[in-house]
Amino acid sequence: MSFRIGHGYDVHKFTSAKQNIIIGGVEIAYHLGLEAHSDGDVLIHALCDAIIGALGLGDIGKHFLDTDNQFKNIDSKFFLAEIKKMLDEKQYSISNIDCTIIAQAPKMLPHIEKMRACLANILEIQISQINIKATTTERLGFIGREEGIATHVVCLLYR
């Protein structure tokens, strides 16, 4: 059996030009949005990078350029579905995924189960294979000042 591990990280800053945020494929009511070329889903972006990294295929930006207008405001679930195809082509399966959302606001806990279900559905895995947790920075740094959100994701693949 062959194992591969990948790590992904993403961060987006808040903007008053949008309302509501999308994290893990779930829309969350908020008075600000996240600035991005796509929908700004920091969790899915980090997850994509983790899987692509584990496959040794670069990063999300290599496959979905942020200068390409076809990806302007696109639903990030599209990226994850495309990366699932890469995973299948390379004949790897997901053992587990562990995600950390770092945000002072809004609160993530009420949305985590919906996020897990959304990601499991796209990746065609069990919800139990995905863990999502959220933390704050105790009001330190740009996240603590509520200027943005960051995520870290680790995934383990096997063949």
UniProtKB/Swiss-Prot annotation:
Reported cofactor(s): a divalent metal cation
Assembly information from the UniProt record: Homotrimer.
Keywords: Isoprene biosynthesis, Lyase, Metal-binding
Naturally occurring in which organism (per UniProt): Francisella tularensis subsp. holarctica (strain OSU18)
Domain of life: Bacteria
Top EC class for this record: lyase
Residues given in the record as a divalent metal cation binding sites: D10, H12, H45
EC number annotated for this UniProt entry: 4.6.1.12
Function, as annotated: Involved in the biosynthesis of isopentenyl diphosphate (IPP) and dimethylallyl diphosphate (DMAPP), two major building blocks of isoprenoid compounds. Catalyzes the conversion of 4-diphosphocytidyl-2-C-methyl-D-erythritol 2-phosphate (CDP-ME2P) to 2-C-methyl-D-erythritol 2,4-cyclodiphosphate (ME-CPP) with a corresponding release of cytidine 5-monophosphate (CMP).
Keyword Chaperone: no
Residues passing through the membrane, by range: none
Pathway recorded for this protein: Isoprenoid biosynthesis; isopentenyl diphosphate biosynthesis via DXP pathway; isopentenyl diphosphate from 1-deoxy-D-xylulose 5-phosphate: step 4/6
GO biological process, one term: terpenoid biosynthetic process
Cofactor binding notes: Binds 1 divalent metal cation per subunit.
Keyword Acyltransferase: no
Binding-site residues, 4-CDP-2-C-methyl-D-erythritol 2-phosphate: 10-12, 37-38, 59-61, 64-68, 103-109, 135-138, 142, 145
Annotated protein name in UniProt: 2-C-methyl-D-erythritol 2,4-cyclodiphosphate synthase
Catalyzed reactions per annotation: 4-CDP-2-C-methyl-D-erythritol 2-phosphate = 2-C-methyl-D-erythritol 2,4-cyclic diphosphate + CMP
GO molecular function: 2-C-methyl-D-erythritol 2,4-cyclodiphosphate synthase activity; metal ion binding
Sites marked Transition state stabilizer: H37, T136
Family to which the UniProt record says this protein belongs: Belongs to the IspF family.
